Every structure is written in C-alpha cells, then in structure tokens.
Amino acid sequence: MAAARKSNTRKRRVKKNIESGIAHIRSTFNNTIVTITDTHGNAISWSSAGALGFRGSRKSTPFAAQMAAETAAKGSIEHGLKTLEVTVKGPGSGREAAIRALQAAGLEVTAIRDVTPVPHNGCRPPKRRRV
C-alpha cells in the first residue's frame, strides 16, 4: 500500500514578459509594503520593510520604504517591466521615498494616484495616545 507522496521540489517561477504594471505602495505608521502587479492585478513581485529585516520603529522609516521599493523593483525588472503606474495608500512616512526609489531603479513612472481610504464618518477612530 504505497501512498502517493508529494514531491519536495517547488514550482519554478515562470518569467513573464510584462511591459507595464502597477505599483501598490501601502505605507502605514508601522510598515511599508510595496507590491508590483500587472495591469490585471496579478502580483509580479513584492517586498516590505519587515521582510527585509527591519524591526520595530525602524520599519516605519523612509529608508526602509526605499529599500523595500528597490527590492520589489529589481524583481519586476527581471520579468521585463519598464513602465509603472503608482497607487499610494496610507499616511506613513515612506510614501515619497518609495516612489523615488522606483524611479531610481530604472522604472518609468507614468502616473501617481493616492487611493488612501477616507471615511465619510464611518467607524469611531481609536482614542488619542497620551505619551
């Protein structure tokens, strides 16, 4: 009774030839996540400050956001990406740094769009911090 065993090898990543895509930058007070997708929304590459080894308050710095954007850009350039639209979400400090890093990596930014959700007086916000 030999049970069918699942092989240990991972599926090799197929190189996609994509000319243009969308960079989704989510910049919160604690972290910055950069996901680069094709125009249909399928992820090509992603990176975040936490995934790069930044911990604690260093995750929320503009430098950490810059490094995350560079890493995501390198992964997407391998798939043939040349032009990007950028959507930025959130109030964090790494917004501008991440956009600049994408441009410095050799990607042409065609549009920058702010898609930060703004409530029309929805949920009650958390109470103010007193430090």
From Swiss-Prot:
The keyword Ribonucleoprotein applies. Part of the 30S ribosomal subunit. Interacts with proteins S7 and S18. Binds to IF-3. Interacts with VmlR. Interacts with BrxC. Belongs to the universal ribosomal protein uS11 family. One of its GO terms (molecular function) is structural constituent of ribosome. Pfam families: Ribosomal_S11. InterPro entries: Ribosomal_uS11, Ribosomal_uS11_bac-type, Ribosomal_uS11_CS, Ribosomal_uS11_sf. It comes from the Bacteria. Keywords: Ribonucleoprotein, Ribosomal protein, RNA-binding, rRNA-binding. Located on the platform of the 30S subunit, it bridges several disparate RNA helices of the 16S rRNA. Forms part of the Shine-Dalgarno cleft in the 70S ribosome. Coiled coil: none annotated. One of its GO terms (biological process) is translation. NCBIfam families: PRK05309.1, uS11_bact. One of its GO terms (cellular component) is cytosolic small ribosomal subunit. This is Small ribosomal subunit protein uS11. The keyword rRNA-binding applies. The gene is rpsK.
